[in-house]
Amino acid sequence: MEEIKKMNVNGIGAGYPAAGYETRRARRNYADQMCNMVPTTQASGGTFELHISNDKDGKAIGSMCGADYSLTVYQPKDFDPANPVYKVKVWDKGGNVTERMVDVSKVDTAGSDYIDMFAYSSHLSASGKCPGAQSAFIRAGANQHGADNRTHDDLFGMKDWISVLKDAMQTQYDAGNLKGYLDYKQFLDFLDNK
């Protein structure tokens, strides 16, 4: 009789608890918690959206959101690859827009702000010159500020991005993450050879 009770709980041949049951249960609970957090986050910090390609601004080649901002790099309709100038728009939590034209051939990787470097790394990825540049740049910035601790004001501060990349590489090396280390190294090597 006792064996029949076990079979009724989980099916024929399964013991209790079923393999993986706790993991599936934990995932559902985590997903429920995340869904419940979204309205609170939007209500307290404002709603941010990724801005995409449009007729007025052009093709979006890079777009991201942070704690209190949204940032998009547009390739204008009159874009000339020989003179790569991009339109960058930054939205703050109040919906105010800052617009800037960035000539990526003039970006100083050892002394520029996040906006110019994001435009430059987006250009390198979109053009195929360094396909992993944008991803490596975003992750290096997250390594410095945390996943979502960068603020609108942080976008305008001047940084030595070569040092930021080297710090991110060292973090990956110390953690034993060879792939992460090599992803940063590819971008850093490209910048060193330009």
Language-model regions: role of each:
Residues 1-194:
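Type III/flagellar secretion export determinants
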